[in-house]
Regions:
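Short, amphipathic alpha-helical interaction segments positioned at domain boundaries
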Residues: 88-127
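Ferredoxin-like iron-sulfur electron-transfer modules
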Residues: 92, 232-237, 260-274
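Short acidic, hydrophobic short linear motifs in intrinsically disordered regions
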Residues: 50-61
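Long, Pro/Ser/Thr-rich low-complexity/intrinsically disordered regulatory tracts in eukaryotic proteins
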Residues: 116-206, 210, 231-235
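Short helix-coil-helix linker/hinge
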Residues: 34-40
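N-terminal leader segment of winged-helix/HTH proteins
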Residues: 1-31, 83, 90-94
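Short amphipathic alpha-helical interaction segments
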Residues: 61-77
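A short, conserved structural fragment
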Residues: 76-87
Length: 274
């Protein structure tokens, strides 16, 4: 077994995706072959789901720590692994396919080959998934609420919990466009990142910093454009993505509808006859 297959299987096992063991025909392996060198794949196989410094990761490997650190930084910029910065110290960990690698590849998702791999593997993941960690949430009409009593599903709670925000292009609609199937909904600066994800995406060149005011404006405009706000994971302390999705472009919204897995909580939407 080579390191590209080993890496795909490791991510599958760590994040408990009930997929068959990978081989060279699988889209995830093809994606890694396109994105990583042999040495990068070997180093990535030494990571797990916890952030570790280069010195820890390379212990027992026949590679200099400085060289490994450069390779790790490069993989983080590519979007294959997550980089965490604490002061002047960097640490690295593996990410699940989604949310994680899928979104982090937005800078290269316009490449038709990469777009095809992402769509194919998304279909594979959906085929074995009972539910996605996503929830559709409403935008409060007054987003600056800062009280403890705010409903779990009100998006202002998530914004209140963080001070760092970023925006990036919609990867799903970018992929659609790369396939010649653009749906017409906006692509530019429609996905919002908060907290540690905002820091990672900005630092590695995948997104740009945004103010709270701009985030609120984007959310309001998304509603005006008929988009749906999706957030995952659902645990509010870990929720770091807010996607503004359309049913004609969002792969996960389309797949969630297919397997009836969009999560609902306290609120039920009804159409008033008035």
């Amino acid at each position: 077994m080579n390191d590209y297959i080993r890496l795909a299987d490791r991510i599958n096992d760590l994040f408990e995706l009930d997929l068959e063991p990978h081989d060279e025909t699988r889209a995830f392996v093809k994606l890694f072959r396109k994105m990583l060198s042999d040495r990068e794949a070997a180093i990535a196989c030494c990571l797990d789901e916890y952030p570790r410094p280069a010195s820890y990761i390379t212990a027992g490997m026949d590679i200099a720590e400085e060289s490994a650190a450069r390779a790790l930084r490069k993989m983080a910029r590519k979007g294959i692994i997550f980089e965490q910065k604490d002061g002047n110290e960097y640490s690295y960990k593996l990410m699940p396919f989604v949310p994680g690698i899928f979104e982090a590849l937005v800078p290269v998702s316009g490449d038709p080959e990469i777009a095809a791999y992402l769509r194919e593997y998304t279909e594979e993941v959906a085929a074995v998934s009972k539910a996605y960690n996503e929830v559709v949430i409403p935008v409060n009409s007054k987003l600056d609420i800062r009280t403890e009593s705010v409903s779990f599903e009100e998006i202002s709670v998530y914004l209140d919990n963080h001070t760092q925000y970023a925006v990036m292009d919609c990867i799903c609609r970018t992929i659609q466009a790369a396939e010649g199937k653009a749906c017409g909904h906006p692509i530019k600066d429609t996905c919002i990142l908060i907290g540690s994800s905002a820091d990672y995406y900005v630092r590695t060149g995948k997104a740009r910093s945004a103010s709270r005011t701009e985030v609120e404006r984007i959310l309001r405009q998304a509603e005006a454009d008929g988009l749906v706000h999706e957030m995952y994971p659902m645990n509010k302390s870990d929720s770091t993505f807010i996607c503004n999705c359309c049913p004609c472009g969002c792969m996960f919204l389309m797949l969630s509808k297919r397997i009836h897995s969009v999560t609902t909580y306290l609120h039920l939407a009804k159409i008033s006859r008035n």
